[in-house]
A protein has these predicted regions:
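Exposed, low-structure sequence patches enriched in small/polar residues
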Residues: 1-288
Length: 288
């Protein structure tokens, strides 16, 4: 006679906590600094969530964001616009149970290691860490032109931008994952602003409608607008997976990808006369 009994006493109903903080510093019209932090511990969840739906790990996040108008650091006569942006953020997820032995709590796995170096090594493997860094200069330009008519060589005709972003990820199955991006833009925009030349207007005084076409005939010797844009973008991606059978083995193949693109465009708008309108656009996309 077999008598099987399955008895369920209770759930591990330990609660967790969460906290969030934010600090914002405004330095007049020069800069803005924002610092934020967020934390959630094991067992935290909404009131209506069941035990299985609550967080089963510890989450820690913090970030620093800065906006700076570097042109404000120079004399006003320079008339430089240089918006600078920088951000740094990090997210760390600490598991409740050892991912290498899911029946053992992480605290017990760490207590079983005698050396501090061994405990640090286990944390580096089991913790999921994501780090983001971003830096950009958007729309850097001089707002000054010559006192007379706009000239092709005026610094105000040029606008440049630069951006760099790095994302680094590591965890139990990933030794390292790196994603880096660069972007550089250089734009040139020139509008001569030259008046239309009407060579016959001063010669023909008659208001006759028959001579109106000749009298009002106008020539634009220069284009109305010339626009050039050059864009360089580069991306590098690298992935090194972790050998869970042999944690010290770093011979797994490295996966990587790289792109380097150079895109150029030209736009020309020219009305040689009042009756003739000319527009030209050209673009080139190249992979380096």
């Amino acid at each position: 006679v077999w008598a099987n009994e399955l008895r369920l006493q209770d759930f591990a109903n330990k609660g967790g906590w969460a906290a969030q903080s934010q600090l914002n510093v405004q330095l007049a019209d020069l800069a803005n600094i924002n610092v934020s932090g967020h934390a959630e511990t094991n067992g935290f969840g909404d009131l209506e969530e069941t035990v299985s739906q609550r967080r089963d790990d510890d989450l820690y996040q913090y970030s620093v964001t800065t906006n700076l108008d570097a042109g404000k650091l120079l004399p006003a006569e320079v008339k430089l616009t240089a918006p600078i942006y920088y951000s740094y953020s990090k997210e760390v997820i600490v598991p409740r149970y050892n991912p290498l032995d899911t029946d053992m709590p992480m605290s017990d796995a760490l207590d079983a290691l005698p050396l501090r170096s061994q405990r640090d090594s286990l944390r580096n493997i089991t913790n999921h860490v994501v780090t983001n860094k971003n830096f950009s200069v958007s729309g850097l330009r001089f707002n000054r032109t010559t006192q007379s008519a706009p000239m092709p060589y005026d610094l105000g005709n040029f606008t440049t931008s630069f951006a760099h972003a790095v994302r680094h990820t590591s965890g139990t199955t990933t030794a390292r994952e790196i994603d880096m991006n660069w972007k550089f833009d250089l734009a040139y925009n020139y509008s001569p602003g030259m008046r239309t030349v009407e060579p016959f207007k001063s010669l023909i005084k008659s208001r006759s409608p028959w001579l109106r076409i000749v009298r009002d005939f106008g020539i634009n010797p220069l284009p109305q607008n010339l626009s050039l844009l050059s864009n360089l973008s580069r991306r590098y991606y690298e992935l090194q997976e972790r050998d869970l059978e042999q944690l010290d083995n770093k011979s797994l193949p490295l996966s990587f990808a790289s792109d380097f693109l150079w895109n150029r465009s030209l736009q020309l708008r020219w009305d040689p006369t009042k009756q003739i309108h000319f527009s030209f656009m050209s673009g080139t996309d190249a992979e380096i």
